[in-house]
Curated annotation (Swiss-Prot):
It comes from the Eukaryota. The keyword Phosphoprotein applies. Keywords: Calcium, Metal-binding, Motor protein, Muscle protein, Myosin, Phosphoprotein, Repeat. This chain binds calcium. The modification Blocked amino end (Ser) is found at residue 1. Ca(2+) binds at residues 33, 35, 37, 44. This is Myosin regulatory light chain, smooth muscle. GO terms for cellular component: myosin complex.
Length: 160
């Protein structure tokens, strides 16, 4: 039955991620699902981007949800697993930030980046965010997220 297929698809997608990643994805999904109906659609994306202070054209938004006009969490995971298969964590982080950079400027508003880091579950405590922030590549209230990701990742290697 379709139900069985859907369940199988869900579980195979879930096996590609660690529990931690799934938790993070859930939080990202919830951040984007502005009306909390369990589905991401064009209106959610619109809302999210307007909260970011940008407004991509409808055609851009439509293209984003073209594959799945009403995307549930599983669909969201599938999309990510396709994008992530074979990518390294650095790439994954970059891609995540890129989603919030609709004009592909390479920058995200500082406040938004802070929110993002603090809301990503237990990954970063306020102190860690503050610590990382001291070294973050910020100019004019915008964060260069590519440099930022390299910095975070470089840090992890130093600690290892």
């Amino acid at each position: 039955s379709d139900d069985k297929k859907a369940k199988a698809a869900t579980s195979s997608v879930l096996t590609k991620f660690t529990q931690n990643q799934i938790q993070e994805m859930k939080e990202a999904f919830t951040m984007i699902d502005q009306n909390r109906d369990g589905l991401i659609d064009v209106s959610d994306l619109k809302e999210m981007y307007s909260n970011l202070g940008t407004a991509p054209q409808d055609s851009v938004l439509q293209a984003m949800v073209k594959e799945a006009p009403q995307m549930n969490f599983t669909g969201f995971l599938s999309l990510f697993s396709e994008k992530m298969s074979g990518t390294d964590p650095e790439e994954t982080l970059r891609n995540a930030f890129q989603m919030f950079d609709s004009d592909n400027t390479g920058y995200i508003p500082e406040e938004y980046m802070k929110d993002l880091l603090e809301n990503m579950g237990d990954n970063f405590s306020k102190d860690e965010v503050r610590q990382t922030w001291k070294e973050a590549p910020i100019a004019g209230g915008k964060v260069d997220y590519n440099a930022f990701v390299s910095k975070i990742k470089g840090k992890e290697q130093d600690d290892a």
